[in-house]
């Protein structure tokens, strides 16, 4: 009986210590987790519109990438570069729906910026934190993201 109580207490301590560390969520097989979101790199080239549509079909709530910190960008670079080498991936930032302002396709606030130039759609270089304005009809690789 004493052993059971000790083991139960041990599991409780582990559960409490893991709360708030991201251990309370799980991404589907093949997806990577960061800051309570799931990410997946697809080795497929698509236009911006096709890439966004593709992401929405991969998982409920999934969209092209939206970035909210340089640390998040670094995480994505660490996932994309080994697979895609030096290239571009579409991110969910565009002014496709709004002619005046850029916005994320997942509806989140534009609170982190790292691009130059003006174009309807934005792509991220897989080697660094730089964003580039590109024609939405160009084909680039796809990385999808959703909140876990």
Swiss-Prot record:
- Molecular function terms, GO-annotated: toxin activity
- InterPro entries reported in the protein's UniProt record: C-type_lectin-like, C-type_lectin-like/link_sf, C-type_lectin/snaclec_domain, C-type_lectin_CS, CTDL_fold
This chain is glycosylated at 137
Q: Tell me yes or no: is Secreted among this UniProt entry's keywords.
A: yes
Name any GO cellular component annotation: extracellular region
Q: What UniProt keywords apply to this chain's record, in alphabetical order?
A: Disulfide bond, Glycoprotein, Hemostasis impairing toxin, Secreted, Signal, Toxin
Task: Provide the leader sequence positions.
Answer: 1-23
The free-text tissue note of the record is: Expressed by the venom gland.
Alphabetical list of Pfam families matching this protein:
Lectin_C
**Which superkingdom does the taxonomy of this entry point to?**
Eukaryota
Q: Which cysteines are joined by disulfide bonds?
A: 27-38, 55-144, 121-136
Instruction: Check the record and name the PROSITE patterns matching this protein.
Output: C_TYPE_LECTIN_1 (PS00615), C_TYPE_LECTIN_2 (PS50041)
Where does the record place it? Secreted
**Main role?**
Interferes with one step of hemostasis (modulation of platelet aggregation, or coagulation cascade, for example).
Which PANTHER family does UniProt cross-reference here? Answer: MANNOSE, PHOSPHOLIPASE, LECTIN RECEPTOR RELATED
Q: Which family does it belong to?
A: Belongs to the snaclec family.
Give the quaternary structure.
Answer: Heteromultimer; disulfide-linked.
Stated name of the protein? Snaclec stejaggregin-A subunit beta-1
Instruction: Give the organism the record lists.
Output: Trimeresurus stejnegeri
The upper taxonomy is: Eukaryota, Metazoa, Chordata, Craniata, Vertebrata
């Amino acid at each position: 009986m004493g052993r059971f109580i000790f083991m139960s207490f041990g599991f409780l301590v582990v559960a409490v210590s893991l709360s708030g560390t991201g251990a309370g969520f799980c991404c589907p097989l093949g997806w990577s987790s960061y800051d309570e979101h799931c990410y997946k790199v697809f080795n497929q080239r698509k236009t911006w519109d096709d890439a966004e549509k593709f992401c929405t079909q991969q998982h409920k709530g999934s969209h092209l990438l939206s970035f909210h910190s340089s640390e998040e960008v670094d995480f994505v670079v660490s996932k994309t570069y080994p697979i895609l080498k030096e290239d571009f991936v579409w991110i969910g930032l565009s002014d496709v729906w709004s002619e005046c302002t850029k916005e994320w396709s997942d509806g989140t606030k534009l609170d982190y910026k790292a691009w130059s130039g003006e174009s309807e759609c934005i792509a991220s270089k897989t080697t660094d934190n730089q964003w580039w304005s590109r024609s939405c009809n160009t084909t680039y690789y796809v990385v999808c993201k959703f909140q876990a």
